[in-house]
Amino acid sequence: MATLTAKNLAKAYKGRRVVEDVSLTVNSGEIVGLLGPNGAGKTTTFYMVVGIVPRDAGNIIIDDDDISLLPLHARARRGIGYLPQEASIFRRLSVYDNLMAVLQIRDDLSAEQREDRANELMEEFHIEHLRDSMGQSLSGGERRRVEIARALAANPKFILLDEPFAGVDPISVIDIKRIIEHLRDSGLGVLITDHNVRETLAVCERAYIVSQGHLIAHGTPTEILQDEHVKRVYLGEDFRL
């Protein structure tokens, strides 16, 4: 089992601390949420783990491998997959070519193995019928499936999902939740940050709540819902799953 650890992360902008001493862990085969009010520091924390935002203090570790100084692309090679909120599909490439764009840079696979892996991913995510479709022609739900399949083409240990429920219709939300559960069941560790707290908590085993740059709660969804501090600053008294 692999473990992704963010330890004592801190970040300041122009002298103002936006993240202070935040720690979290994600294990293989579990779904973890990183949530909080707008401006709480959760997105900055998430981006420090991904490698988009440099941390001022703290460490990012996969098992015993400290990757704190590595850029995003190097972290990807160590096992961190990242799916941004914005559409990241190559619009003028087919679904097949989108997958091969990642598989081609994997020097651990032969040409035949890359072809086999592309076919496996299309079958796994039920996008075989879209093989020759251009990225720009896909629906929101189809695009998300292709983007997740492409992220898995890099063979990550963990996948970090930025706002996976944003900009998709209710049917697609259900579909994405099933995909996230499938990723967990496949042995990946999944970290989600999303403004849709209801859908995120519904799919998580654990969650971390950040407010004003500090970690204020950590636990199961039930524990989070019962936390009085979380109710006061984030969820309110009447929130229910």
Curated annotation (Swiss-Prot):
Induction: Transcriptionally regulated by sigma-E factor. Residues 4-237 form the ABC transporter domain. Pfam families: ABC_tran, BCA_ABC_TP_C. One of its GO terms (biological process) is Gram-negative-bacterium-type cell outer membrane assembly. Keywords: ATP-binding, Cell inner membrane, Cell membrane, Cytoplasm, Membrane, Nucleotide-binding, Translocase, Transport. Its EC number is 7.5.2.-. It is a peripheral membrane protein. ATP binds at residues 36-43. It comes from the Bacteria. One of its GO terms (cellular component) is ATP-binding cassette (ABC) transporter complex. It is found in: Cytoplasm; Cell inner membrane. Part of the ABC transporter complex LptBFG involved in the translocation of lipopolysaccharide (LPS) from the inner membrane to the outer membrane. Probably responsible for energy coupling to the transport system. Belongs to the ABC transporter superfamily. Outer membrane lipopolysaccharide export (TC 1.B.42) family. This is Lipopolysaccharide export system ATP-binding protein LptB. It comes from Escherichia coli (strain K12). The lineage of its organism: Bacteria, Pseudomonadati, Pseudomonadota, Gammaproteobacteria, Enterobacterales.
